[in-house]
Amino acid sequence: MPDIFQQEARGWLRCGAPPFAGAVAGLTTKHGGESKGPFASLNMGLHVGDDRTDVVNNRRRLAEWLAFPLERWVCCEQVHGADIQKVTKSDRGNGAQDFATAVPGVDGLYTDEAGVLLALCFADCVPIYFVAPSAGLVGLAHAGWRGTAGGIAGHMVWLWQTREHIAPSDIYVAIGPAIGPCCYTVDDRVVDSLRPTLPPESPLPWRETSPGQYALDLKEANRLQLLAAGVPNSHIYVSERCTSCEEALFFSHRRDRGTTGRMLAFIGRREEWT
């Protein structure tokens, strides 16, 4: 069965989960841009030491591919936490061309307005895409192990339930390409921080490979948290792609030993679709 994230003709993967058909949703690859050296070539991160002009040009190129102008993007700081902020058209442009203007202190964004593209950077962490088609809500979260330990996926569901009056049964989620357990070994500190966030009866999303070392399935940990938050299993779509394994396609912070570019995860609704 093909993965839910399939490559477009240009340098990005489209989220093909059916509930996301009314949104512009996907993830860039490492190809098709102007960046050089370890950032070659479609680096989307303004904060990694790459030439800013190259990164902005890369972002403008994606904006053209998507027909979603860069001036309508909203980016956030991404501090490896679990805080989330609702944004509107008044926030458009924040973080799009300058990291200093990114929405501060949060790792998730959501909006109920069309004409806003939520955009976050990734290079192994888990991109989590949310949509409630009946309400016109879209959201995006950055879940590294710290954000997962903080329950960021469930936090998005809780915010939509309590502030937007959306039942978890009306929410659909796509868990995008990220580092898999094949390539992600962690220690006791990490698994101990995740343990309290998981449903008590669920299988653990890790296996011990040697004393104090564990192969962690971060995508599965987030799936379990979404189930615990009330999202139906049939509403959760999970990519099998590993960002570390697919070296020809993705940047990987762990594989590339920290000096590398970033992919961009994005989701939004076009104004003409409302």
Swiss-Prot record:
Gene3D superfamilies: CNF1/YfiH-like putative cysteine hydrolases (3.60.140.10). It comes from Geobacillus stearothermophilus (strain DSM 13240 / CIP 106956 / 10). Its cofactor is Zn(2+). Belongs to the purine nucleoside phosphorylase YfiH/LACC1 family. Purine nucleoside enzyme that catalyzes the phosphorolysis of adenosine and inosine nucleosides, yielding D-ribose 1-phosphate and the respective free bases, adenine and hypoxanthine. Also catalyzes the phosphorolysis of S-methyl-5'-thioadenosine into adenine and S-methyl-5-thio-alpha-D-ribose 1-phosphate. Also has adenosine deaminase activity. Inosine binds at L46, H47, R262. It comes from the Bacteria. This is Purine nucleoside phosphorylase YlmD. Keywords: Hydrolase, Metal-binding, Transferase, Zinc. Zn(2+) 2 binds at C182, C183, C242, C245. It catalyses: adenosine + phosphate = alpha-D-ribose 1-phosphate + adenine; S-methyl-5'-thioadenosine + phosphate = 5-(methylsulfanyl)-alpha-D-ribose 1-phosphate + adenine; inosine + phosphate = alpha-D-ribose 1-phosphate + hypoxanthine; adenosine + H2O + H(+) = inosine + NH4(+). InterPro entries: Cu_polyphenol_OxRdtase (IPR003730), Cu_polyphenol_OxRdtase_sf (IPR038371), Cytotoxic_necrot_fac-like_cat (IPR011324). SUPFAM superfamilies: CNF1/YfiH-like putative cysteine hydrolases. The keyword Hydrolase applies. The keyword ATP-binding does not apply. GO terms for molecular function: adenosine deaminase activity; copper ion binding; purine-nucleoside phosphorylase activity; S-methyl-5-thioadenosine phosphorylase activity.
